[in-house]
């Protein structure tokens, strides 16, 4: 099977984890930023996580270098354009990219400028390539909560014009949802959809709480539900889709190996699952790689792939018109 030619949807992709290493060097030179090295292979080694990390926190260290060149409007716009371009080249037809605007304020940009620059880059890619997209605004859970509503307000003017959803990301501690109930409610009032990173590190209760307390329509990763009956049943009964990221889940030790990933069990039992990259650079992956790995490891047919593709379309935060275009590509 030609996996490259299959139409694909990626609903869980981090902007700062999907930066071209060469672009880090280029932007650093333009902006007089000192890097540890200007050697491409060395920069790449600092941006790509090991095949297996000690834990999620070690994996997250790979974001420091790209963030250093994502503090200006030009840098953010270029990197946004390039992630959509890279995805389009491998037949990703719709891409939702997430990033945390609060991490891009070190050189004086406003939150609105940060978000606007990313949207501008995406729209340039949409004009040049056969791809549609949207942004999801992430809040890093261990940062102070006093600016969360500022992010929501800054993104509100872009709702359904480049921005579609609110997310909580970063290190996962048990019981984090309770502290964000007012923020999720405020985001929904402002027109945001909701997807939450939960159950990535095995805490199934977090998935339950993200759905019950925060109104999550999708869950980032979510594999912790396999050991939490209530979360599993709620995920199914509420038709909440899981954004599974197989390569990343192995790297962060969320699962021991791809073969032990609960993907197939979820799929066979009617849990709504999707296939995603998480971080194209940090995980050294593409959607083509993810689809190939999943189809081969779990022996999925072409028909089964398109069933999963349709789940991705239906549970995307795309407009109805874009969804119709995407569904028409399913064979």
From Swiss-Prot:
- Top-level taxon of the source organism: Bacteria
Co-factor: note: Binds 1 zinc ion per subunit.
Q: Which residues bind Zn(2+)?
A: 12, 14, 197, 278
Binding-site list for substrate? 14, 16, 170
Keywords from the UniProt entry: Hydrolase, Metal-binding, Nucleotide metabolism, Zinc
Q: Name one GO cellular component term.
A: cytosol
Site positions (Important for catalytic activity) are: 221
Q: What is its EC number?
A: 3.5.4.4
GO biological process terms, alphabetically, are: adenosine catabolic process; hypoxanthine salvage; inosine biosynthetic process; nucleotide metabolic process; purine ribonucleoside monophosphate biosynthetic process
Q: Name one GO molecular function term.
A: 2'-deoxyadenosine deaminase activity
What reaction gets catalysed by this protein? adenosine + H2O + H(+) = inosine + NH4(+); 2'-deoxyadenosine + H2O + H(+) = 2'-deoxyinosine + NH4(+)
Q: Which cofactor does it need?
A: Zn(2+)
Q: Which residues form the active site?
A: 200 (proton donor)
Q: What class of enzyme is it?
A: hydrolase
NCBIfam families reported in the protein's UniProt record:
aden_deam (TIGR01430)
What role is this protein assigned?
A: Catalyzes the hydrolytic deamination of adenosine and 2-deoxyadenosine.
Family designation: Belongs to the metallo-dependent hydrolases superfamily. Adenosine and AMP deaminases family. Adenosine deaminase subfamily.
Protein name per the record: Adenosine deaminase
- Species, as recorded: Shewanella piezotolerans (strain WP3 / JCM 13877)
Q: Which gene encodes it?
A: add
